[in-house]
Amino acid sequence: MISPARDPGGPVQPGGPVQPGGLPAAWHRDWAAWASAASIVAANVLAVTGYPVPFLGPALGFWFLVVHPVYLLCTTSVWDGSGWAERLGYSLGAVLLLALLGGLGLNTVLPPLGVGRPLDPFPVAALADAITVALYLFRRRNPARPSWRQCLASIGPVGGRMTAGAGACVALAVLGANRLNNGAGGQVSLIAQGGILVLAFLLLRCRHRLQDEMICVTIYLLSLALLLMTSLRGWYVTGHDIQTEYFAFQLTYSHAHWDISSFSNAYNACLSITILPTELAQVTHVFNPYVFKVFFQLMFAVCPVLGYTIARRYYPKWISIMAVVYFIGFPTFFTDMPFLTRQEMAFMFVCPAILAMTHRQWGLRRRRLALIAACLGMELSHYSTMYLFLGALTVAWLAESGSRWIPQRWRGTVGAEPAMAGGAARDSRTLSIGAILTATVIAVGWGGVATGTMGGAVADAGAVASSLIGKTAGIRSGDVAYGLLPGSGPSAQTLLNGYRRQTMGQRAGSASAAYLPAALVARYRTPAVTGTQAMPLTAAGRLLAAAGIPVDGLNAVIRQAAARGEQLFTIIGLTAILFVRRGRRPPGREYLCLCLGSIAMVALITVLPDLSADYDVLRAFQESLLVVAPVLVAGSCLALRPLGESRAIRAAAAVGLTLFASTIGFVPQILGGYPAQLNLNNSGEDYNTYYTHPQEVAAVNWLSSQPGVLPAGVQAENITDRFAFTSPGTVSGQQVIADIYPTLIRPSSWVVLGYSTIHTGQSSVFYEGNLIAYAYPLGILQASKNLVYNDGGAEIYR
């Protein structure tokens, strides 16, 4: 018997053929669209009313502003020729750029129309609706041929187990961070790290039974677990740069309006930490620190996935997986990046830029337009990332242009994709002088003309020039010690003496009564504290020590070997690409030149004076790993080639995983004898310096309620802005937190001592690119001021 729905001769039911359940077939096909529409309505209601729905409300708001628009754009035919991970990278970058530009448009257009708070929930929700409708209509006109359901159907048992294991690591990372925040131990976080190590090994072992999509899902979850271990530490904003980022965000959020003049600082020019988090906060209505702690990490965890996709352009699975292991195992990824959310968002534009430049199936104009759009997003997100990327592009263009001077016998098809050898290789060049100049105009236009915050870069250029011609000595960050040829920098005490001389010069330019008397200050010494206290040896560490293995030095040796080994492997890999051609398929010319440009920028920051202090060399190397990590892995394999090809691959993987186990903190935590890491302990330098305690928050709230605080001034350990007023009623771009170094204390100021200074007797200053700890003389405050607040974790003197 033929049902009416399938009977070509039967009457056509209104709304289409009827399924056995009694509903039209179109309803069955479009159930996802109806569910999405209902969710959008619910998200709008929750965003505008602010009605609290724990967990579900914030998740729905994030889906509304980011996830659903990304899905709509990802499932269009505009990305034909790209895999799903690459589609995700392009789509996420495009949606973030739309959110940045759309928020900037609201901020610019609405105030002249009488809307004083253009970034309130209603305008932001309307913007999200407009983006959703536009992308939905675009998707209807350009539907994607492949279906995401096909990807789900091809998961397989191995992929399912890998995904479940990686998801468990994320859950353990969240639980472990919460346990540490409640004063418990780091055992759960350590188990999560162990799971990450096991799954990284299984990814390599089972790579032939896994499709690239499932490898990408596993990489995403493992990366997210590492990020959340750090970002979720503390119930408030914890970290270094993120304190100032949060301050800039609160200025925008509290007024629902971004104004560069309210805080004339380069941080405030980064829309990724002003307008973007304000939009997220207005539709999620979550406790504001968790916009940075959770939602930014959910987006940034896509970056290693895109790194894998970049590597898969030219390299097999095992090299691409190991490239990701080196990328997420580099300490900057999980110890610094969660505290550098503006750079996290900038990386979300770096990756699509690299993918677009090396896309062989796209036309030249399309690649260049994608590159320029990515540069715009980069500049709006983070100035330093844009400067480094622009420098890398310039070097890459010079390298490409100079390749025509290579003798003919060496030229051949070196650096060209196999499908683009010969004359087509030259036609495939994305970089041009026009593209470089356009990117430069974007950087100067936003940083120089629109916001006037490019002065730091100009000053750095002048300082470098002055150092090179011998007028000044120049300064270097202590991080350059991790280079292949480290220099012997000044001692901590020498640096602290230089800081003291600088503060004395500052005093000399002011009235004598502006600071505490010099005779009083001279009675209190501030010796530098050298060395970081290591964790005690564990049972496993004591066992190794009893066997004659110096555990105290072992971890440090492994870290140094990791730093220098990665640089050495990169050099070997690049040398092989450039000069060893026999039997090897060279990567693309564009990719090779990008590698050269990235390494050149890291080298310049390391070698040139002053740059390493303002443009962190470790962060620059993290950015370079997006392109050079697979070259690094290939170089490690070549270095071990005397073992035989098969054994060299296994040995290279073993070396990479061993370094990974050490750099993420697993081995030091198991053995002890190494400084404690914040993601695993409630101790250590980062914990003492950057962790925000509830008592400190209570002290700042009490201080903000006192009359006449800002005119009198506030002094605190100012390597971070965690003592700045950030609540909506008190945040002000005019507030300045002066340092508490004894020579800078003013008689009438309020002096705030944090948890670490009270309990360890130490404070820190950041000088010439170095963090310097010193013994703080509490007696100078007791002799010159009155203790007006003490809650056991913070003290305030007046």
What are these regions (language model features)?
Residues 297, 313, 455-527, 532, ...:
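Extracytoplasmic
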Residues 91-107, 132, 172, 218-227, ...:
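Membrane-embedded helix bundles of polyisoprenyl
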Residues 35-44, 214-224, 371, 570-573, ...:
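Transmembrane alpha-helix segments characteristic
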Residues 154-155, 205-209, 364-365, 407-431, ...:
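Membrane-interface helix-loop-helix junctions at transmembrane boundaries of multi-pass membrane enzymes
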Residues 74-90, 137-146, 208, 359-367, ...:
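Membrane-interface junctions at the ends of membrane-embedded or membrane-associated helices
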Residues 55, 61, 182-184, 203-217, ...:
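Active-site lumenal/periplasmic loops and adjacent helix-entry segments of GT-C-fold
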Residues 1-12, 19-213:
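Membrane-embedded, hydrophobic transmembrane alpha-helices
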Residues 62, 66, 188-195, 343, ...:
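Hydrophobic/aromatic-rich transmembrane helices and adjacent perimembrane loops
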